[in-house]
């Protein structure tokens, strides 16, 4: 079963993503720890996810060149200082969201939109979303179903282009409700 919805990745990358997820889960649950979501955590998570995917010089570090996102006209910032400033703003602004579901969506969408790394941004964003949820004892939910992947991407692209969270939040909440109904 593809727990993390890492479709299209090689087995090595799926295993890395899974191991990173399990490591975060164990840390948070061990002694009721709270994982602080800061720059250090973000870089550590990206490094764990991107090892072997990008060069060692780029793994766990902000990108220094431009990137493009397929399926959208949105172009993320290119300048390292702009990326760093926006990332600091995102990490600071997360404190405004006391509801863990809202915080998770906020962090995921904004980090994914910023594309702070050369590759692995959506995977890193989903892991940060998971950490925000696990900090509140909420089980993260992912799906590898084609329809869900399509809705996930549509929700993110809508956010990239409009700044409107509603499409992604709808997908996110539908997956949470589906999981809860499956438990009943």
What name fits each language-model region?
Residues 1, 5-184:
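FIC/Doc superfamily catalytic core
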């Amino acid at each position: 079963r593809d727990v993390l919805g890492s479709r299209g990745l090689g087995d090595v990358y799926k295993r890395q993503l899974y191991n990173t997820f399990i490591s975060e889960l164990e840390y948070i649950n061990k002694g009721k720890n709270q994982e602080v979501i800061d720059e250090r955590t973000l870089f550590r998570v990206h490094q764990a996810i991107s090892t072997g995917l990008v060069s060692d010089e780029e793994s766990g570090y902000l990108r220094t060149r431009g990137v493009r996102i397929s399926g959208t006209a949105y172009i993320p910032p290119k300048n390292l200082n702009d990326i760093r400033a926006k990332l600091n703003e995102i990490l600071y602004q997360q404190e405004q969201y006391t509801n863990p579901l809202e915080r998770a969506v906020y962090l995921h969408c904004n980090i994914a939109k910023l594309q702070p790394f050369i590759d692995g941004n959506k995977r890193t964003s989903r892991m940060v979303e998971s950490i925000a949820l696990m900090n509140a004892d909420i089980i993260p939910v992912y799906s590898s179903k084609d329809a869900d992947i399509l809705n996930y991407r549509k929700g993110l692209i809508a956010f990239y282009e409009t700044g409107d969270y509603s499409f992604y939040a709808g997908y996110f909440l539908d997956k949470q409700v589906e999981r809860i109904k499956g438990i009943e």
